[in-house]
Structure formats: structure tokens, C-alpha cells
Amino acid sequence: MKEKIILIASWLCVLLTMVMIFCFSAEDAEKSTQTSAGVREDVLDTGLPDEQVTPELVSKLQFPFRKMAHFGIFMLLGFCLSNAFERTIQKKWYISYPCSLICGILYAISDEWHQNFSFGRGPTIKDVLIDSAGVLIGISVFVLFIYIFNSIKAKKSIK
């Protein structure tokens, strides 16, 4: 019963991440810019003194912040997909990780296509590549966590 609940929770995390991505992609260009500007300003306010946060700096960092947001949210998706597929296709990493990558890339493509319907926005191959890289890194982080967890578990069982 516990495993079934964890499996459902794992897929729920995937679904919630996908919904979050969908909602961000549904924003028109102006709203999307405001959202990322708010986050960017919060980060800059936290990391730099007020006198160093100039309008030029804020403007200069707009593009990198937006791309890091793309990368980060798709990294989360890759991690969640890996967890869900790992629990669904137990002990078959050679199936679960490629499935995670394929699903993540397909979602990145569909996300860019979806942006085509949001006013002032459009799809770019660059964003698909950034999103796909995020998925791949998310899967890699998950694999690393599993490796570390299994190593610790094995050491405890030896003692």
C-alpha cells in the first residue's frame, strides 16, 4: 500500500510540474516578462546591495534569467519523470531513464508549440534545446541521488 501511495505521489509531482510549465507558457509576452522581472529583481535584491542594481544590469540579465528559469523548471520535470518511471518500471533503468528523457523532450517541444498560441510569444529551437538539457540534467541528478542512496544503504547493510 505504501509503495502505491509513493507511486501516485511521484506521478502527481510530474503532473504538477507539467501544469506549472503549461501555466507559465500560457502567459502572454507582457505577463511573462513581468513574472521573470519580479523573480530577477528578488534575486538581485537578495544578492547585491541596492546601489549595484542598476537598470542596465537588470536589463542585461533579463535573457539569462529567463533561460535559467526554462532550464530549471525542466530540470525539475526531468527529476520528477525519472522518479516516477523508476517506481513504475522497477529495476529497469535502461527503460525508465530513456522514457524520462523522451517524455521530457516531447513536453519541451509541446511547450514551445503551446507558446505559439500566447500573444507576443513564439516557439524557438533554442528553448527546446535549453529545456531538453534541463530534463537531461534533472535525470542525471536523480541518477546521482539513487547512486548515493544505494551506496549508503549498501554500507549500512555490511555493518
List PLM regions with ranges.
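Interfacial helix-loop-helix junctions of multi-pass membrane proteins
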Residues: 108-132
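Membrane-interfacial alpha-helical segments at the cytosolic side of multi-pass membrane proteins
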Residues: 73-88, 133-149
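Membrane-interfacial, low-structure loops and terminal tails that flank and connect transmembrane helices
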Residues: 153-159
